[in-house]
Amino acid sequence: MGPREPFVVFPAIDLKGGRCVRLRQGDFGRERVYDADPVGRAREWERRGARALHVVDLDGAREGRPVQLALIREIARAAGVPLQVGGGIRTLEDVRAARRAGAARVVVGTAAVADRDFRLRALEELGADLVVAVDAREGVVATHGWQRQSGVGAAELAGELAAEGVRAVLFTDISRDGTGEGAALERTAEVAGIIPTIASGGVRGAGDIRALARTPGVVGAVVGTALYEGQATLEELLAAAGG
């Protein structure tokens, strides 16, 4: 076995109405605006040492089609680091549009869960640059901007994706997202034991990052609220990750 890849801390830039916001537990009615200038925020994260950014088109997630691609293109030009982009990407044309906008990796959620043929075609198109979002509430995958329960277990879906050749998933425990209550280590570890996993939801500081970085199969973490609320600095999280 070769050396473990460096653990990546992804500062989150969640876009809604052209602004950088955070939602609590995916609830569009519980929104907090953190920055009216997402492009400037992306530059700031890069300046402070981020090796990649996680950008979510929340308007797209709710509408079922990409909405913020022009802004994502601006962020990609300004940031100087790779973007992992998701939100409303449900067709191959959406995948290609995200790539044209500057996405280094594309996160596909709802369509990949609901339509196996689509995810196989997306995998053929993107290869290792495809990340499938496994968003779970109480261990059951949710879709359509987290508004619907799929009835599929997170571990079950992870197993299917691994068998198909998907290289990574983004696992979000919805109950923790935007809360700063701490990462869902046990549930994340269950998925990461099946397929390489980027953790998301609830990370509150360096202790969570250290614990995730030590968990077999966890290759990164998306951090939003903890950074925007000042619970931790990016520098602290990068140091905890070993980078």
UniProtKB/Swiss-Prot annotation:
This protein's record includes keyword Cytoplasm: yes
Cellular compartment(s): Cytoplasm
Transmembrane segments: none
Major site of localization recorded for this protein: cytoplasm
GO MF annotations in UniProt: 1-(5-phosphoribosyl)-5-[(5-phosphoribosylamino)methylideneamino]imidazole-4-carboxamide isomerase activity
Keyword list, A-Z: Amino-acid biosynthesis, Cytoplasm, Histidine biosynthesis, Isomerase
Active site: D14 (proton acceptor), D135 (proton donor)
Pathway: Amino-acid biosynthesis; L-histidine biosynthesis; L-histidine from 5-phospho-alpha-D-ribose 1-diphosphate: step 4/9
Isomerase keyword on record: yes
One annotated GO biological process: L-tryptophan biosynthetic process
Cited SUPFAM superfamilies: Ribulose-phoshate binding barrel (SSF51366)
Domain of life, source organism: Bacteria
EC number: 5.3.1.16
A GO CC term assigned to this protein in UniProt: cytoplasm
Catalytic activity: 1-(5-phospho-beta-D-ribosyl)-5-[(5-phospho-beta-D-ribosylamino)methylideneamino]imidazole-4-carboxamide = 5-[(5-phospho-1-deoxy-D-ribulos-1-ylimino)methylamino]-1-(5-phospho-beta-D-ribosyl)imidazole-4-carboxamide
CDD domains named among the record's database cross-references: HisA
PANTHER family tied to this protein: 1-(5-PHOSPHORIBOSYL)-5-[(5-PHOSPHORIBOSYLAMINO)METHYLIDENEAMINO] IMIDAZOLE-4-CARBOXAMIDE ISOMERASE (PTHR43090:SF2)
Protein family (similarity comment): Belongs to the HisA/HisF family.
Official protein name in the record: 1-(5-phosphoribosyl)-5-[(5-phosphoribosylamino)methylideneamino] imidazole-4-carboxamide isomerase
The organism of origin for this protein: Rubrobacter xylanophilus (strain DSM 9941 / JCM 11954 / NBRC 16129 / PRD-1)
Lineage: Bacteria, Bacillati, Actinomycetota, Rubrobacteria, Rubrobacterales
